[in-house]
Amino acid sequence: MKVKSESEEGGGLERFGAYCKAVELFDLVVLDLSKHSSDFTLTRLIAQQYASADSIAANIEEGYGRGSRKEYTQFLVIARGSAQETMGRYQRFKHWLPEGIINLRTSLCREIIAILTATIKKLRDLEKAK
């Protein structure tokens, strides 16, 4: 059974708001942190931030590709956790990034989390109604 959810309305995954914002967030993480890549004390934190930001979009993609509503929902839960992780680490980057950047990025993370939360609820409600 192919998953039918808000992510498919009007044309598929690339029109799902959380996915588009997750891809945007990853690009911003790279932009924000690439200038700090020569600071060896930040190597691990930067790698973790790249990984958690990438994981948001990657888990949405994988869940979408699974084709079942139940699995898609589970991968959205994982993506939401990665968004939470990315947001928390941005807050801890306060020692190296300007406050304005941190506020913008954490706001974007909150938007992603809100969309994912609403979608998860909708998919779970549909699953219960079966």
Predicted regions and their residues:
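Amphipathic alpha-helical assembly/interaction segments
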Residues: M1-K130
